[in-house]
From Swiss-Prot:
GO terms for molecular function: flavin adenine dinucleotide binding; tRNA binding; tRNA dihydrouridine synthase activity. Catalyzes the synthesis of 5,6-dihydrouridine (D), a modified base found in the D-loop of most tRNAs, via the reduction of the C5-C6 double bond in target uridines. Keywords: Flavoprotein, FMN, NADP, Oxidoreductase, RNA-binding, tRNA processing, tRNA-binding. The lineage of its organism: Bacteria, Bacillati, Bacillota, Bacilli, Bacillales. It comes from Bacillus subtilis (strain 168). The gene is dus2. This is Probable tRNA-dihydrouridine synthase 2. InterPro entries: Aldolase_TIM, DUS-like_FMN-bd, DUS_fam, tRNA-dHydroUridine_Synthase_C, tRNA_hU_synthase_CS. Transmembrane segments: none annotated. It holds the Pfam family Dus. Belongs to the Dus family. Its EC number is 1.3.1.-.
Amino acid sequence: MTENFWRELPRPFFVLAPMEDVTDVVFRHVVSEAGRPDVFFTEFTNSESYCHPDGKDSVRGRLTFTEDEQPIVAHIWGDKPENFRKMSIGMAELGFKGLDINMGCPVPNVAGNGKGSGLICRPAVAAELIQAAKAGGLPVSVKTRLGYTDVDEWREWLTHILKQDIANLSIHLRTRAEMSKVDAHWELIPEIKKLRDEVAPDTLLTINGDIPDRQTGLKLAEQYGVDGIMIGRGIFTNPFAFEKEPKEHSSKELLDLLRLHLDLHDEYSKEEARPYKPLPRFFKIYLRGFRGASELRNQCMNTKSTDEVRALLDDFERKYLDGIE
């Protein structure tokens, strides 16, 4: 194995969770500006697409990163060991510091086909994928859930994964069936940590689920002794979730982050075509909590280009500048 960066991280370390159509190079840079985590993951990258003769072009945008994002981990999914073997070698050549396997995605057309969280029902395949992913020499990690249907599945499933000699295990503390509809099962953390200590003490343990910010994560790490904290959906309500010294943020700061997002979208679109259509989903992150935010957000949702959004922001700031705090 090449250098295992996980071992060099502070304790606890903080990770921005991989999120489909969210954690691309553009949004990661916005988060880094607002408050940087210790580790970045890419979006979900389909190993089958990557290994298809024409596939590398289709996933190139998902694998775009810059060196100032290091350490960054390629987050991949699929169910064919040979594809994982090829992809692990390719990710090492691209300069990624680690490879993370998705065993938690609950989306029906993924899980229902035995991929993502569907691998919980295919433990032998899951083990094969992990071993194949080690071919490139990168530290291999896994992101998964407590179980597929029942919470009680966690012990057998996590024991199996911990026996595979992985660098880090990130656990979304819900089952596939629960999606995100129930509270994360924080109450299981002590038992899960005990299991890790017994089965694979060298594997780092990262928890995920209902953790809104660094401060909450620090309390959980102190209480339970886990190694890492992963924040996902919390970033949508607080783009400053990873900041080390929490403080009140002005509306101007939020608008400036949105402008940065627009600028980065345009910049990276020059390298790889990036459709505008997914961009408005991010507006709710920045356009909230200040006078006129709701109306401005509704206007921005109907735009067709970044320049249209900038024009609306310019107009808004001219009208409300004195009220922006």
